[in-house]
Each structure stands twice: as C-alpha cells, then as structure tokens.
C-alpha cells in the first residue's frame, strides 16, 4: 500500500549544490532593491534568480571584514592588527561567498513567496554573485515543485476488496505458528548435509578486493531458505557438512541505490548444523504458555483472530482505495522526493533485516531498490492526491486527529507521546504531523463515499492474473 506519511529528509538530493534552509525572511533597511525571477515553467525543476541590493548588503560585508580583522592571523602582523585593506584583499572571495550564502538564507523564503513557488524538497544554491561596490547580491537557486494535475472524481469510485471471513483453519495455523515459535534447535549428525530450514553456525571471512584490502572475520548464525543470505551464498552452503568450507570469489557489493561499489572474496566454514524440533500440541504445551488447557488456548486464539480480521478489513479497504487513487491519476514524481523516499524505504528494509540478525553488508541492495521503487513512487503520488483533495474540500485535522497521529507515532517508535511531541517540536517537524493527520482524514472521507465491493478470494486471484497477462502483453507489443 502507498503510505500517507512523509519520509524524513535524509539529506539526499537530485543535484549537487549547496543546500539552502528556508527560514523566515529578514527585513531590509533603507528600502533596498529586491528582485526575483523564476524560470523553467515546463518542468518540475525550477530555477529562481534573486537580486538583493541595499545598505543591508554593504553592512553585512563590512561587518564580516571587521570580524575577520580581529580573528585572522596574517603574516607580518600581530593577530587583530592587520590593516583592513589587506584583510579585504586577502579574504575578498571568502567574504563574498559567505555573505552571499547568508543573504540567500535570509531572503529566499520571501523571494519564493513573491514568485508564488513552493519547493517540495531541497533547494540548491547554484550560483552567487556579489558586487561590493554596488552593495548587490545576485543568486540562483534550483528546486522541484509539486506537479499540477486535475483531481479525478474520487468520490464515485467502485473498489473491489477481497472478502475477509473467519475460518477455523486460522486457529490451526496459529497453533502451528506457536509451535514454530517455541521450537528448539538440536544439533544434527555431523554426516548430515545442510538443507533448507536448517540453522547453520558459520565462521566467515570477507576480504575486500582492491582499496585497502580490509579483512573481516566473524561468527554468526543463519537459517537457510529465509533470505538471510544472498542467493549465491545460500546455494553454495546447501548440501555441505560440518567442517566443510565454501569460497566465493569476486562477489559484487552494492550501495543503497543499487550501484556496484566494489567486490569481495568470501570464505565460509560450517561449524555446526542444527535442525528445528517442534513441541507436541497438548494441554502441557498450553500450560507452558499460561493457559489452563489446550481448549482455553484455542478459544483465546479464536477471539483474537476475529478482532484482528475486523482491523484487517479496514486496513485492506484503505490499501485498495489508496491504490485505486494512484492508479487513476497520472502524476509525474519529483526526483528529489523520489530519492529521499527510496533512501528511507531501503534504510527501513535494512533495519528490519538487521533486527532479524542479518549482516546487511552482504544483502543485495540493488534488488531492494528495485522492489521498493514502485512503492516509493506510489507513496509520493498518494500524498499529492490527498493534499489536493483536502485543499479542495477544506479538510483540516482537529486537535484530536493530531493527538491520534502523535499516539500512532509513539507506538510505532516504542516511546511516549510526550517524547514524540518534544522531538517533533525541537526539530520543527510539527507541520509534518499536521499534514499526515490531514491526509489520513482526507482518505477516510473518500472511503466513506466510494462503493466497496467484496469479492471472493478466488475471483480476486483470477483478476490479478488477468491484469498481469494484459500488462505482459502490452509490454511485449512495445
């Protein structure tokens, strides 16, 4: 499902340049001349040229020279005693660059408002020119803006969702899951080969090819068949016995964007192979879990599943409506937002793998990027759609809506509501919470108006297959 919440800014950008903050505009003295011009109207990338002229520019330049005069050490003079004209000659380029950046910081927000431009992500300072004599600063910034699009008739959609019903088989499946969770690992005979589902205790040595030739030697545990290792590593380990070694030469490494960043040689020695042993399903097992009997355990499971199915219905409806909204709108995605979203999703996937005890240095990052890119694009499109709907319908979150959003964040990050509020306030992120709460409210409003049609699971699968066939045929004809 496309996600409503914005990905945090991890500092990624689509182009090189100086990242400019967007603080409140600073006042200018003596009616200084300010001028801004925007360009690039046919693209999401925009360039804005801003000219600032007045006494405030001259004052900032003079002030910086005087500060430097007091602090810099110039050969032939004691600290703070060099003539101002020498300081000006030596540090002219530095002062002009720093003053230009400072004035860009102070004036950019006002310039953007005058040009009626709203960046959706990072703003890059591409060029700064300072004329000390005229007291003039001219700078150029580039950034991306939100795409313009027409909102479709989202309130009269028909959305199909799979029919979700309680089945007694779910209780049996949960009991099996509990058995799996309470299983024990017992050593296999040394002559038995490793197979899928086995836990391997291995000692591995990784040697970087080229560079500094760094070597890493560690011991870890992995379960074959759970995607904890790259496919080629898993295949090499299958069928091996305790004491045997495998070697993989020139294995490529990838960064978070899927680009190859180097190669390594890996040597793995199997120290132990363990098999999973499941407990018997009886009253004794139920008592170990805190229930009087197996019957009591089954009843509790049944009750919990029914509650979860109700929540699942709501979640599936949200997902299908969100997917439908994205499907019916053709919206270009700003590349700066896409890079940020990709970085966030890849990082989150890596943290999930780390939580499972997986060494993410050898995970196929390129594959993860390919998997999450459609999700990243859908997330961004959905936010634009819900923002536009909320704006057109005048939807605003209440205090209760915002409080609920903070509560959800606190649960997500395993902390208190007060701590979350403190963090968002200190980092000037309160507007992000407000916008996420507004999007959530907009989606609920849309869901209340669309027609929800429940279909049997079999029909659902058949329609998915039909869509996939149509997609493949269209790709084959292009």
Swiss-Prot record:
It is found in: Cytoplasm. Its EC number is 5.2.1.8. It comes from the Bacteria. GO terms for molecular function: peptidyl-prolyl cis-trans isomerase activity; protein folding chaperone; ribosome binding. Its main location: cytoplasm. Residues 455-472 have a biased composition (Basic and acidic residues). It holds the Pfam family Trigger_N. One of its GO terms (biological process) is 'de novo' cotranslational protein folding. Residues 197-279 form the PPIase FKBP-type domain. GO terms for cellular component: cytoplasm. InterPro entries: PPIase_dom_sf, Trig_fac, Trigger_fac_C, Trigger_fac_C_sf, Trigger_fac_ribosome-bd_bac, Trigger_fac_ribosome-bd_sf, Trigger_fact/SurA_dom_sf. Residues 1-41, 455-478 are annotated as: Disordered. It catalyses: [protein]-peptidylproline (omega=180) = [protein]-peptidylproline (omega=0). Keywords: Cell cycle, Cell division, Chaperone, Cytoplasm, Isomerase, Rotamase. Consists of 3 domains; the N-terminus binds the ribosome, the middle domain has PPIase activity, while the C-terminus has intrinsic chaperone activity on its own. NCBIfam families: tig. Involved in protein export. Acts as a chaperone by maintaining the newly synthesized protein in an open conformation. Functions as a peptidyl-prolyl cis-trans isomerase. Belongs to the FKBP-type PPIase family. Tig subfamily. PANTHER family: TRIGGER FACTOR CHAPERONE AND PEPTIDYL-PROLYL CIS/TRANS ISOMERASE, TRIGGER FACTOR-LIKE PROTEIN TIG, CHLOROPLASTIC. HAMAP family: Trigger_factor_Tig (MF_00303). The N-terminus of this protein overlaps with a tRNA(Leu) encoded in another frame on the same strand. This is Trigger factor. It comes from Aquifex aeolicus (strain VF5).
């Amino acid at each position: 499902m496309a996600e409503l919440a914005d990905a945090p800014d991890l500092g990624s950008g689509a182009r090189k340049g100086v990242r400019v903050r967007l603080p409140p505009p600073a006042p200018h003295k003596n009616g200084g001349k300010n001028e801004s011009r925007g360009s690039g109207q046919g693209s999401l990338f925009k360039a804005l040229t801003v000219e600032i002229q007045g006494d405030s520019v001259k004052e900032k330049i003079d002030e910086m020279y005087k500060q430097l005069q007091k602090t810099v050490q110039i050969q032939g003079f004691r600290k703070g005693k060099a003539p101002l004209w020498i300081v000006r000659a030596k540090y002219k380029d530095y002062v002009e660059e720093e003053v230009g950046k400072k004035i860009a910081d102070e004036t950019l927000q006002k310039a953007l408002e005058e040009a009626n431009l709203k960046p959706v992500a990072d703003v890059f300072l591409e060029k700064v020119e300072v004329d000390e004599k005229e007291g003039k600063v001219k700078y150029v910034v580039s950034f991306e803006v939100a795409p313009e699009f027409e909102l479709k008739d989202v309130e009269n959609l028909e959305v199909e969702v799979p029919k979700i019903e309680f089945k007694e088989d779910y209780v049996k499946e949960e009991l099996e899951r509990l058995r799996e969770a309470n299983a024990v690992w017992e050593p296999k005979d040394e002559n038995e080969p490793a197979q899928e589902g086995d836990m391997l205790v291995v000692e591995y040595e990784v040697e970087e090819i080229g560079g500094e030739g760094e070597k890493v030697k560690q011991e870890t545990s992995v379960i074959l068949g759970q995607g904890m290792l790259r496919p080629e590593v898993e295949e090499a380990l299958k069928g091996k016995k305790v004491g045997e070694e495998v070697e993989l030469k020139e294995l490529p490494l990838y960064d978070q964007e899927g680009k190859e960043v180097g190669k390594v040689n890996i040597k793995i020695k199997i120290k132990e192979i363990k098999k999973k042993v499941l407990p018997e399903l009886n009253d004794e097992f139920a008592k170990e879990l805190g229930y009087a009997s197996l019957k009591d355990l089954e009843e509790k499971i049944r009750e919990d599943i029914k509650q979860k199915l109700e929540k699942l219905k709501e979640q599936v409806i949200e997902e299908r409506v969100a997917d439908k909204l994205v499907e019916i709108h053709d919206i270009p995605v700003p590349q700066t937002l896409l890079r940020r979203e990709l970085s966030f999703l890849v990082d989150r996937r890596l943290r999930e793998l780390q939580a499972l005890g997986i060494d993410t240095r050898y995970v196929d990052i390129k594959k993860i990027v390919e998997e999450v890119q459609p999700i990243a694009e859908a997330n961004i499109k959905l936010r634009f759609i819900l923002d536009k709907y909320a704006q057109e319908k005048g939807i605003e979150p209440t205090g209760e809506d915002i409080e609920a959003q903070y509560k959800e964040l606190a649960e997500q990050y395993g902390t208190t509501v007060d701590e979350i509020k403190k963090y968002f306030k200190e980092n000037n992120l309160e507007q992000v919470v407000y916008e996420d709460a507004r999007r959530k409210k907009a989606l609920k409003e849309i869901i209340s108006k669309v027609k929800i049609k429940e279909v049997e699971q079999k029909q659902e699968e058949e329609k998915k297959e039909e869509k996939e066939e149509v997609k493949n045929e269209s790709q084959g004809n292009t």
